[in-house]
């Protein structure tokens, strides 16, 4: 039996099984990106940032299906099945490349998007509205204060109306004596939220892009394996694939 065919069939069978696990992994990654975005959506004006995540989840659903198709086609040595398997892999490969490109594009646009929206959200802080809850969540979760730093609060109406203090969410954890006075910097988180949120979103997108790239490489070898089996079968149709 041709070693190329044996190797290719083995790769395809493993690839088909991996597709199920990969589908679950991609679904998790896509959901993680969307969840991370939703946690801070008040500070993001461009919802197109979610395009890579949407593509990832769509690919995950399809991968569950083609994992089954791939197993059946490889075991039964069906040329039609293998051809269909190859087409689907190529489509998924193209979708993953597209998601990767979108990830690169929107990774470079995060800072500009944050700069446009964060100042507006912080200026609307009044202690009661939805922007207030978003800012408090951001500052407490990321341990930051203000857009660039804690002094940004001096430009807000909140600061003037509350005895020149910043919100309690600017206080360091477990600092019960913190009153929000800028004269007590040791009790406050002094790093700006824009830089921290940008880093969080950059890390999330980078993680997603690495996963996409890894699975795209697997798909590439899968396409090569299908081509090897198909070509060898045409040349040796009289010879069974298994002895």
Curated annotation (Swiss-Prot):
Highest taxon, organism lineage: Eukaryota
Swiss-Prot/TrEMBL keywords: Developmental protein, Endoplasmic reticulum, Glycoprotein, Golgi apparatus, Membrane, Transmembrane, Transmembrane helix
Entry's localization field: Golgi apparatus membrane; Endoplasmic reticulum membrane
Expressed in which tissues: Strongly expressed in melanophores and xanthophores. Also detected in eye, brain, heart, skin, fin, testis and ovary.
Entries under PANTHER family matching the protein: TETRASPANIN (PTHR19282), TETRASPANIN-36 (PTHR19282:SF120)
Function: Plays a role in migration and segregation of pigment cells (melanophores and xanthophores). Contributes to pigment stripe patterning in the epidermis.
The protein's name in its UniProt record: Tetraspanin-36
Gene of this entry: tspan36
